[in-house]
Amino acid sequence: MRIAYDVTPLSHPRTGVGNYILGALKGMLAAGGHELIAFGPVSIRGRRVLDEALEGLEVERRLVTVPFAHATRRAWGALGRPPAERFLDSFDVLHFTDWMRPPQRSGLRATMIHDLGPLRYPERLHPRTVSMHTGTAREARTSDLVFVNSEFTAADVAERLSVAHDRIRVAYPGVDERFAPDGPRFDDGTPYVFTTATEDWRKNVTTLRAAWPLVDSELRLVTPADVGYIQDERLPELYRGAAAFVYPSRFEGFGMPVVEAMACGVPCVVSSHPSLDEAAGDAAVRVDPESPEAIAAAIREALARRDELVPQGLAHARRFTWLETGRVHLQSYADAL
């Protein structure tokens, strides 16, 4: 198969979406046997960031450098022309991944939805962000394949977007090899509990902060606000150095930081929410994310059960590989053609 894969999110500082896109691309390349084309309009600066991300990957690049790249991507889908074939020649599959919805004349049409949080909680987001997610939802209804990152999101997409179950494919994210117990550890002289939770309402760091005085520990709480913007390459060090990892999120499509922390050998405290069941499995202490008292008790429990939770977490994390993510994509394309 000749597969055109939208990599435009990799032209920005890396996020969970970008990590998934790069991981799935690497997984498909590792599985082998098919032609992969990285495509999309990007800015001059974005092109440099994207080239860094794709360095060393044997993938054909069809990248168009344009000013106002984000606006260009949105306009391309809104205008419905020119067709993607003009830039890509022929292809069997066109897979778009984020805000860009390119028109096409032929071939299988596939997309990815990471979660439907913006449609569940529109009052928590800027109207423009909600509008963009609504557009993505409309496209999902007309795509041949809709990839999701969990069974939870699959059910959400089927119910809320009325997408037929036979067009939805679950492709779990993988864990990069750099997330492992051995390696450098963050250490500033004070033992700590780590969280990636931010001020975003869904991430729920406010309730975690309210819980912290109740933990009654000499440990300190380390959040992204305490260490500044966390570059992707620093995450393994922060996980490894932690006495425990807390993920008090109110809603997720999957919850990859939980698996990353487990892969680094850290006991985890995770919200008791269906969206995190698949990420945490039975290898974490589950907790009501709205109760500071429950969160404090769960942190104390995770610290006390470290010898039990760490091996369970390591075993659970080994289930998630980018090679398997890539194989699911390729098999899904082949089955649908």
Where in this protein do the model-derived segments appear?
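Carbohydrate transferase catalytic cores enriched for Leloir-type hexosyltransferases
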Residues: 1-337
